[in-house]
């Protein structure tokens, strides 16, 4: 797993991504709308820079979608009901692959997870971009990965085929201090368990400061953007 950010890393990642036919980028960091008019989250900047160098890449900004929370159907009193055939999203436009089975999609007609799953099953590589908040990947990423639980549950434990075994995965996260490495490692294991074809070269992180969480300063946060641009220029 790559540890420290620099321009060479960016070029290596782009080179790796070019071997795939269709790449899906899922950006998960957010800001208040008026702030977004003036600045972009660092992880999203990386996604946009890389996408410009690829011939067939689609970016979906997850915070822009209306994605309802996971309902926890994997651990109901009447047993694991996640991803069963009865949860099929019966809509050819939203679910052309026929793979999308999620109760929350059925229970919430305005849910937009289908916009991600539809693109996912048409891609051979997906990269998640997230920020680190309180020792974990931020809430928009977490909500997304929980809602995709039905993908894993179809073959563990339902015993069906792994529908993402040919889709490579990556996870790139941005953090202020020491938790970024831990978050990246955990999500790599998570994606492997999900059934993705994990690509080691697409899992890395960037930290603004090589410090412990209790050593952070306001100055360090203020300097994080200039340092980010300096390292990746």
Identify what each model region corresponds to:
Residues 138-140, 157-203:
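Short, glycine-/small-residue-rich phosphate/pyrophosphate-handling segment
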Residues 55-61, 195-206:
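Short beta-strand elements in bilobed, periplasmic/extracellular small-molecule ligand-binding domains
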Residues 209:
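Substrate-binding cleft of secreted/luminal carbohydrate-active enzymes
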């Amino acid at each position: 797993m790559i540890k420290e950010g620099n321009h060479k890393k960016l070029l290596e990642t782009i080179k790796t991504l070019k071997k795939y036919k269709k790449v899906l980028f899922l950006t998960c960091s957010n800001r208040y709308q008026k702030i977004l008019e003036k600045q972009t989250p660092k992880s999203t900047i990386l996604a946009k820079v890389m996408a410009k160098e690829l011939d067939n890449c689609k970016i979906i900004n997850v915070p822009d979608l209306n994605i309802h929370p996971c309902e926890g159907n994997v651990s109901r009193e009447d047993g694991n009901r996640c991803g069963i055939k009865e949860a099929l999203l019966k809509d050819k436009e939203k679910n052309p692959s026929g793979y999308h089975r999620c109760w929350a999609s059925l229970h919430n007609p305005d849910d937009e997870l289908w916009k991600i799953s539809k693109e996912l099953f048409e891609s051979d590589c997906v990269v998640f971009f997230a920020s680190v908040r309180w020792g974990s990947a931020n809430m928009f990423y977490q909500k997304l990965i929980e809602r995709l639980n039905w993908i894993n549950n179809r073959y563990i434990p339902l015993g069906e085929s792994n529908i993402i075994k040919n889709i490579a995965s990556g996870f790139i996260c941005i953090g202020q201090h020491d938790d970024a490495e831990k978050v990246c490692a955990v999500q790599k294991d998570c994606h492997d368990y999900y059934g993705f074809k994990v690509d080691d070269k697409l899992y890395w992180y960037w930290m603004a400061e090589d410090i412990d969480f209790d050593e952070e300063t306001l100055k360090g946060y203020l300097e994080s953007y200039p340092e980010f641009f300096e390292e990746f220029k």
